Amino acid sequence: MKRRGLFLLLCFICFTEIRTGYGQHEVKRFFDLSGPEQFWVFTHLFKAKKGMSVTAEVLRITDSVKRTNSLDQYTSGGKIDAFKHSFWMARLSQSIGESAALSLGKAHEKGNFQDFKKGLKEDGEIPDLPASEMDDFNNKFGAELIKENPDLSKKEVINTLIRSIEEGKLRVLKRSPEGSYLTCKGEPVVNREDQIVWETEKCLVPSNE
């Protein structure tokens, strides 16, 4: 009972900090987050506002890169998805540090698993294990890029990541020329509308395939 009381007190304090330290729009964005992401905010109060700002910037720039057609148009499982996650972790690492950035990435993936269990979609698709493994790989790539090159400018990060994607250093999900998901054997992935599966047959491949 004492532990529960302390936990509720902590939640109240954190909520008060969020209401007083963030604008109305930011508070709304907080409540749009998944449970694991909200918990990350609770445990990183002094970094969360920067994290939200960086995330908004990353989404804007990713949309701009998508409109240039320099990668592809697949916001889930494609090159532009790989760019988004690696760029997100790179910019977060520069802003709030590698450890906090990666822990936010993990919280996001936990949120995706919760969405899977509820049958909810992200970027038009229900999350699954191959997509989560892809995100995790690309998240780590972005964080490692900054660890090895901490002084890269934003433009240099963007160009380096695009080049790395073209060189096959990141990961995407295998597709047919028409855009359908393929297994590692090159066969179409069978989707059953009556069954939602976490461990699908989608195949993780280098980003230049």
Residue positions per predicted region:
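Bacterial N-terminal signal peptides that target proteins for export
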Residues: M1-F7
